[in-house]
Amino acid sequence: MLKYNQLRVGRYNILGKIRYNSQPPQRQQPLYNRLSNALLVVYDQNGNRLGVLENADDPILEQEIGSVDTLTFSLPYNDPKREYIQNENIVEVVNQRYFIRDVSKVRAGGRLELVVYCEATWYDLQYTEPMKALSWQDATPEQIMADILDGTGWTVGRVEVTERRNLQLEEGLTNRLKALRELPNVFTGELWFNTSNNTVDFLRPEGRDSGASIVYRKNMKEIEVNYSTKNLVTKLYLYGKNNMTIEDAHPEGLPYIENYQYTTKKKVMVVKDERFTNPFHLYERGVYALSILSRPTASYVMKVADLSRMSGLSHEQFALGDNVFVYDKELGIN
């Protein structure tokens, strides 16, 4: 989860009623290209630029890869651009676009303001026409995504994952966003939605090496680190559709896999996933999952000053999904 606010503070850790517009709005070039200095820009429903919200206060982006992307901000009630804050108008942050969903009039401490909640334009994928295809055999993510997005105004972008899987969606499923979110559960990849050009990427979960460093007394204001073995597993029994096992795929013909990379303790979990009909696909996915489950999880929550807007420090810029270097000598974090 990544949160930004106007003070350039980030928050990290490891881990309504919506109207669907079948015709995507026209595009104009973004006014800003860096998040650290960007102001909010508002457009009408047809994509015509209305103005820059210079007086928008406390803008907060809350983002999590492939699942959460919302924007909240407030605006003084007497702001002359208040008239642009209409439900279903579009707010742009650099090259990311959001539909205005909720507008509240608030009186707090003698101050009148509008409090605005927005959702990324890709949220509307959950309110589209029913899908034509619900089943795929030995298909790549690109093939499945193309079928899911067909007729939505969105298209497949960059796909780095080339493995093949079988996938059967439940009959009557009309939520294409929910269908897309099945892919990370079956393949090893991450969904990235590009609201600037209405494309969806499916990338390997490796992250970009940003080159940025977060260091105490430099740009780190607060940090909280947690290490946990609450959900640690070292032995995994896997079952697919109709209680299919992985015995045909396992090199030793076993119905389970093991990984003792962190501890020799035997901690067993049984998993059944009806989406898998091929034992080799289930085995491959299980090996990957256990490589993660068999080691402690770590989460880092930090408040960080964004230095990238300062002269000579543009290399300190980072974004959601990037790899960053974290150092705190006193806490032994490196």
What kind of feature is each model-predicted range?
Residues M1-R34, V326, I333-N334:
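Viral virion structural and adsorption modules
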Residues P30, R34-G66, R217-V225:
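Solvent-exposed edge beta-strands and adjacent loop segments
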Residues D57-K81, E222-N334:
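An acidic/polar, Gly/Ser/Thr-rich interaction patch typically located in mid-to-C-terminal regions
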Residues P76-V159:
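Surface-exposed cap/loop segments at beta↔alpha junctions
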Residues Y84-I90, G172-L173, R217-N219, G321:
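Glycine-centered loop/turn motifs
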Residues N87-N95, R164, G321-K329:
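Short conserved beta-strand and strand-loop elements enriched in small hydrophobics
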